[in-house]
């Protein structure tokens, strides 16, 4: 009987040790075949041109200030301000042109001596072959520059594993309301 208890105890200890051996913190990661995620395909370069409509006025603004700028910088740089956006992306400059998606995210006044914004947004496409796909932009936007360049840091759907950049050019800016239309040329490498 004591031999049986000893054997059972040894087996329980062995099973417990085996179960715990996989919990050393290294079993959460593994190498997989690139082809399982569609990475065996040839990489493509896609150019998208959309117009981003930042509407801060009216009954249905698409851009809402969450936090105003620090008082010291309120008129010079907007430093410290936080604005959430759900801006229409259209095929042409007029806001009533065909909507192909939304720019959703935020911009933050991040510069003290100029109007320099930190842009963090997803361009979420709603039509055509890119319906349901997104690209993610995270970068600096010096609003007063004629052309601004921001990096594409990722994407989803058709733009999985995306990288690239966006060139932004202001097409319309209403000094009274603050409403703006920006042309965005997106150059995206993806599979």
Swiss-Prot record:
Family, per entry: Belongs to the plant dirigent protein family.
Example GO BP: phenylpropanoid biosynthetic process
A GO term from the CC aspect: apoplast
Subunit architecture: Homodimer.
Residue positions with a glycan: 96, 131
Signal peptide span: 1-21
Assigned keywords, A-Z: Apoplast, Glycoprotein, Secreted, Signal
PANTHER family, alphabetized: NUCLEOPORIN-RELATED (PTHR21495)
Pfam families: Dirigent (PF03018)
Function: Dirigent proteins impart stereoselectivity on the phenoxy radical-coupling reaction, yielding optically active lignans from two molecules of coniferyl alcohol in the biosynthesis of lignans, flavonolignans, and alkaloids and thus plays a central role in plant secondary metabolism.
UniProt keyword annotation of Acyltransferase present: no
UniProt lineage: Eukaryota, Viridiplantae, Streptophyta, Embryophyta, Tracheophyta
Protein location: Secreted, Extracellular space, Apoplast
Annotated gene: DIR3
Protein name, as recorded: Dirigent protein 3
